Amino acid sequence: MKFDVIIIGGGLAGLACGIRLAEQGKYCAIVSAGQNALHFSSGSLDLLAKLPDGRAVSQPLSALSALAELAPEHPYSKMRNITQLDELVQEAEALLRRCGLDIVGSSAENHLRLTPLGSCRPTWLSLADIPVAPLNGPLPWQRVAVIGIEGFLDFQPQMVASALQDQGIDATADYLHLPALDRLRDNPSEFRAVNIARILDLPENRQPLADELSRLSSTAEMILLPACIGLDKSAPLDALRAVVGKPIQLLPTLPPSLLGMRLHQALRHRFQQLGGLVMPGDAVLRAELVDNRITGLYSRNHGDIPLRAAQMVLASGSFFSNGLVATFDKVYEPILDLDILSLPHRADWSHSNLFAPQPYLQFGVNTDNHLRPLRGGVALENLHAIGAVLGGYDPLQQGCGAGVSLTSAVFVAEQIISEMAVTL
């Protein structure tokens, strides 16, 4: 099986890279092992919220020079040696909008998103259904009704309302009861956001839901709900807003996250619409190397039939997705045994304080400035690495996980397009 480009991993980075390549007419295949980290996403995407020394960042692009001094191995720092990062960021934003995603935010300045705990966190882009506020401004509501779903344990409205009250908001907490959900409620394992959304999205349930929300929010100017409506798109929520006559915003729930799934579905649909091939439920097990080039990939489902392409992209994720594997004494990349940025002594991998920066989160594949992975100190000629498999950054403490995924995806796609044009 032969393609122009094979991408290992179908998460945010892999899909974004595949979309950009397919938009330029490249025949791409994505080998995806299963559910990716987008199913755990809040629906907001971070670019850069904090520098490694702990300083908060309000304008991400203005902080890149300071970041390069503090963290030269950070993917942003490496990409800045080759191109202008602001161009990659702008293309990433445009790519998401071409996928049909209604997003708010800008790289010019972070904004605040409301979390399921009722606190605010800085971020770059958010789906339009998520409650947001200016970075240095007050929350834009005075009276808020936080409404949960009776029997739904993955969202606690009292916790959100209490946190909002601490911020000077007149917030109330309540639970709605909808008879249409009673069948799901009988089985707690079935009473999850995705299954609830399948019922709440039905047109026949819209009016009963609207009546219940109106009853519980009579004095509120805005309603906050758990993200349990609008499974595939926001149309059911828009229709509900029209009936209720008030703004309704969604807060992410415990996984699986409906907002994250919506991101994934939009990206995957765009990739396949452009002619890309997704191989779900498969995993690349090993690679065939000749003269520092990958000549074939062998996957679990295809056995001894190699997958061949002129260019390969490693977007296999971090520990969560098995893109990196940790044993008792080492961390390694399982397909090609690529060079890893890590620490030699296991005792140094983590800190006992759970909320302190954890060194292992910065572990990942080491690359050159073109994001070509190193193997024995030598860059592989036709392989690039993108997203969470990269080392040199802490996506949690620095608030840059999605930004690294999207910018590295666009960066590598543009390089591959240029290289293949020269080859032709």
Swiss-Prot record:
GO terms for cellular component: glycerol-3-phosphate dehydrogenase (FAD) complex. It holds the Pfam family FAD_binding_2. Its cofactor is FMN. InterPro entries: FAD-dep_OxRdtase_2_FAD-bd, FAD/NAD-bd_sf, G3P_DH_GlpB_su. It catalyses: a quinone + sn-glycerol 3-phosphate = dihydroxyacetone phosphate + a quinol. SUPFAM superfamilies: FAD/NAD(P)-binding domain. Keywords: Flavoprotein, FMN, Oxidoreductase. Pathway: Polyol metabolism; glycerol degradation via glycerol kinase pathway; glycerone phosphate from sn-glycerol 3-phosphate (anaerobic route): step 1/1. Belongs to the anaerobic G-3-P dehydrogenase subunit B family. Conversion of glycerol 3-phosphate to dihydroxyacetone. Uses fumarate or nitrate as electron acceptor. Composed of a catalytic GlpA/B dimer and of membrane bound GlpC. NCBIfam families: glycerol3P_GlpB, PRK05329.1-1, PRK05329.1-2, PRK05329.1-3, PRK05329.1-4. This is Anaerobic glycerol-3-phosphate dehydrogenase subunit B. The gene is glpB.
